[in-house]
Amino acid sequence: MPLIVPEAKKSPTSLVEELENRTFTKEMLRYNKILDAEHNSIYNEMIGVLNEKNEDENSSIINILSLDGGGIRGLVITQIMLEVERVMGESLFEYFDWVAGTSTGSLVAAGLASGQTLRELQRVYIRFKDLVFDNRRPHNTAVLETFIQEELGKDKLLFDLEWPRLLFTTTKADYFPVQLELMRNYTLPTTDDENFELGFKNSEKLYLWKALRRSSAAPTFFSAVDNKYIDGGIISNNPSLELLQEVQFWNSFNKLKNIPKSVRIGCLLSIGTGSIPSTKLEPAHLELAQNYITQPITSYNAVITIGQILIDQVKVQMDAKGDEEIAKMMWDCIEYMYIHQDYVEKVCTLLRKVGKSPKRREFFASCSNYTTNPSTPVK
C-alpha cells in the first residue's frame, strides 16, 4: 500500500485534513477474516457481559496492556497511543491495571507509570537518540545508564512505581539455553521464600534504572548487565503471552490459597513497533545467535495468536537517529491509525466499558502482598 509522503509545501494541518478526508478501501486494511471473526466474537461477548453488570460488579474485570521492544521505535508506541487518545479524548494509560513491556516497551511503561505524558516521552526519545546512539556498536553503556537515571531517578526502585502492575522481561544469558526472567513491581500474597520459589525474585530490591537496562540490553547494541542479563526481546519481544499467563497464574495462586479474588480480562491491547530490517550477522556473533535460536517463542507467533496493532510498513533500525527517517516513521503511524479507525474505536469502546483502573486498585489492594523486611537495593 503506498504511503502518504508529506510534501514540502504542505503544512501539518493540511496533511491531517487530507488524511481525514480520504476514503479507505478494504484492500488497504490489515484484514484476516478468520482472526477478525474471532476477535469480533470475543468483543461482542465481552460488551454483552459489561452491559449486564453494574459498575460495582465490573470491578474484577481489568484492562491489560502489552508494549513491544524495538529501540527508537518506542516512538511508534507513543504515537499509536496518542492516536488512540485522540479518539478517546482523554488519557489512555489510566485505563490499564496491568502492563507488560519488553525493552523500549518497558521504558515507555516506566515513564508513563512515573507520571510522564506521551508527548513528554516523545521528547525523551528524541534526546535519547541524539545522546546515546553514536556511529558505532555497541553503543556507550555508561551514557545510556546515566540518561535513564537522569530521566527516571537514580535511587528509585521498581517497587516505587506502585500502580499499575508492571511486568518487564529480560533474558538470563549465563545459562544454555537462555532463560526468560520477569521483573515485577508486585509480589504474591505469601512469604519471601515462596515468592522466590515461584519466580518472584527480589524485584522489591531492584533499582528501576537497572530493571530497564536489563530489559533493553540488546546484543551488539549494548553490553550485558552484570555479565548475564540481556534484552528481553531475545525471547519475548511481544510480552502479551507472558502477561496473559501472569494474570492466569495470579488467579490460580489465589484459588490455591483460598483467597476469594480473581480477575477477568476485559481488554488486551498489544502495541507493536513494526518489523525489523534483515541485517547480515558478522561471524563473531554467529555463536551468540545459535544460543538464542533454540528458544521456541517468537514475537511473530504471539502476534498471530493474539492480534495486535502492528505497523508492518515501519522498517526502521533500532538505533536509527536521522530526523527525516524518524519523522516519516511517526507519520506512518498516524496514517495507519486513520486507516484502521474502526478498530481503534472498538478498542476505545471496550476500554470505556471496563472503566479506568483507579477504581480497581482497591480491589487488588484488598489482597495485600506480604511485606518483606527492609533490604539493600540491587545496584
Report the location of each language-model feature.
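Conserved catalytic cores and adjacent C-terminal regulatory segments
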Residues: 2-379
